[in-house]
Design a protein with these regions (language model features):
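NAD(P)H-binding glycine-rich loop region in Rossmannoid oxidoreductase-like domains
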Residues: 35-89
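Conserved Rossmann-fold NAD(P)-dependent oxidoreductase catalytic core, especially the SDR/UDP-sugar
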Residues: 88-139, 164
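Rossmann-fold NAD(P)-dependent oxidoreductase module
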Residues: 15, 19, 93, 152
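Flexible, glycine-rich beta-alpha linker
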Residues: 112-114, 161-176
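Active-site Tyr-X1-5-Lys
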Residues: 132-165
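Conserved glycine-rich Rossmann-like NAD(P)H-binding loop of the short-chain dehydrogenase/reductase
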Residues: 25-33
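SDR active-site strand-loop-helix element
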Residues: 6, 30, 59-63, 104-110, ...
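N-terminal Rossmann NAD(P)H-binding glycine-rich loop of SDR-like oxidoreductase domains
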Residues: 3-23
């Protein structure tokens, strides 16, 4: 299986690539930290990196500015644009592919859900958050980012590719 991992130079991308390669899969890492076996991209525009999407079985987009920071306007804008722009351009690459991937796994976030103790949140019954009376303002910002991120995924014109938003929470790794 050929997997293209955009934004694949971060914590999750390194672990994913290592595990997939150990299973015998071909992995193409696309990232801003070019060098070695990393195909360079800027996360905003189509470029030579997009040719790797054509003929891939799976694309995994892990790109996005780290949330490990203070949530001031500048960082929130970086979080938003790094996620929305990279998702948009991955969609453009898939749409332009003569042989598009069967699956597009798109990182998202579980912070899209409301804080609740009465029931679990999932895709079928989950309650979107950000409007809880006791919620700090930055929660709303996180939900706005997640909502626009997933909207960009949904609206990508990729009819021959199954799109999956991965609503994960914090991921820890022995690599860091």
């Amino acid at each position: 299986v050929k997997v293209v991992a955009t934004g694949g130079t971060g914590q999750l991308g390194r672990v994913l690539a290592r595990e997939l390669r150990a299973e015998g899969h071909e992995v193409v890492i696309v990232g801003r930290s070019a060098g070695g076996d990393v195909v360079p991209w800027d996360g905003r525009t189509l470029g030579p990196w997009a040719r790797h999407v054509d003929g891939a079985d799976v694309v995994v987009n892990l790109a996005g500015r780290s949330v490990n920071c203070r949530y001031h306007k500048h960082h929130l804008a970086e979080m938003m644009f790094s996620r929305v722009d990279s998702t948009r351009v991955v969609g453009e690459a898939i749409a332009a592919a003569a042989k598009p991937p069967r699956v597009w796994l798109q990182m998202s976030t579980a912070t899209i859900y409301a804080h609740r103790l009465d029931a679990p949140n999932d895709e079928g019954t989950g309650v979107l958050g950000g409007f809880e009376p006791e919620a700090p303002g930055y929660w709303r910002s996180s939900v706005d980012i997640a909502t626009q991120w997933e909207r960009t995924l949904r609206e990508a014109p990729t009819p021959n590719t199954r799109k999956i938003a991965i609503r994960s929470s914090f991921a820890m790794s022995p690599d860091r």
